[in-house]
């Protein structure tokens, strides 16, 4: 399998791992109070971002999987601020957990792991560990990539990815043969990207003989409507 397809599989696998979480048990021993406060801002404008989920959780890796135990989750205020307290069982530190405070995508905004601050961590009990935290989110724009299979060539890999600020934020489509295009029967890709900046779209096709044909385009999307981008292949 081509390298790009392998990357796509790995990214999808990690996403599924990170999406698995449970509620933390109610503290019954070794209980201590911790307060988290700060602000969620639009990274591009500096304005507060409302109705964004902020989560306090225990987390640790078990093999390749990250175990996440949610202690408390709140939404940022209209001004983007958050301020809450929770009881935690400090014995979890001795069990190999770290305490994490995270911001998530929500409402009109998305997070980017490659740009901006999206989490804070504590490895021991510290009442001020999560004071004055600023998290970054980006105004969301909707991009639809429309696929048109107009050629009759054979290939062993075809991948579409997108990114902003010079990085790759998502592998949106990956097939290993023309037959898989037909079998999948998916010709519109719904992509959430960042508003008012250029989104790079990379289209890579690898022929049977190993020759790579790479096309890179950019499109500027707006939060006020849907942007369409057509790919003929």
Where are these regions (language model features)?
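Short, acidic Ser/Thr/Gly-rich low-complexity loop/linker segments typical of extracellular
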Residues: 63-86, 169-184
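A short, solvent-exposed loop/turn motif at the edges and junctions
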Residues: 90-126, 204-214
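Short, ordered, surface-exposed loop/turn motifs in non-cytosolic proteins
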Residues: 45-64, 151-171
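Post-signal-peptide N-terminal segment of Sec-exported extracytoplasmic proteins
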Residues: 35-81
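Solvent-exposed, conformationally flexible loop/turn segments
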Residues: 31, 120-130, 138, 176-186, ...
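Sec-dependent bacterial lipoprotein signal peptides
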Residues: 1-20
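Short Pro-Gly-centered beta-turn/loop motif in secreted/extracellular proteins
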Residues: 78-99, 179-202
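Beta-strand-rich domain onsets/edges
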Residues: 20-35, 39-44, 129-140
């Amino acid at each position: 399998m081509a390298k790009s397809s392998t990357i796509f599989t790995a990214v999808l696998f990690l996403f599924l791992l990170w999406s698995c979480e449970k509620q933390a048990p109610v503290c019954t021993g070794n209980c201590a109070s911790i307060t988290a406060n700060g602000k969620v801002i639009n990274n591009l404008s500096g304005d507060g971002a409302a109705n964004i989920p902020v989560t306090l959780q225990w987390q640790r890796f078990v093999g390749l999987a990250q175990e996440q135990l949610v202690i408390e989750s709140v939404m940022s205020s209209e001004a983007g601020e958050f301020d809450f307290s929770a009881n935690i069982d400090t014995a979890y530190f001795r069990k190999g957990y770290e305490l994490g405070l995270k911001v998530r995508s929500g409402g009109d905004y998305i997070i980017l792991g490659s740009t901006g601050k999206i989490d804070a961590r504590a490895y021991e009990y510290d009442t001020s560990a999560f004071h004055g935290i600023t998290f970054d989110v980006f105004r969301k724009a909707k991009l639809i990539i429309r696929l048109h299979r107009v050629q009759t060539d054979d290939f062993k890999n075809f991948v579409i990815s997108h990114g902003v600020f010079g990085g790759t934020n998502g592998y949106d489509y990956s097939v290993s043969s023309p037959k898989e295009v037909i079998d999948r029967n998916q010709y519109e890709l719904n992509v959430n990207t960042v508003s008012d900046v250029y989104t790079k779209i990379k289209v890579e096709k690898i022929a049977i003989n190993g020759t790579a044909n790479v096309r890179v385009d950019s499109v500027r999307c707006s939060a006020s409507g849907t942007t369409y981008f057509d790919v003929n292949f």
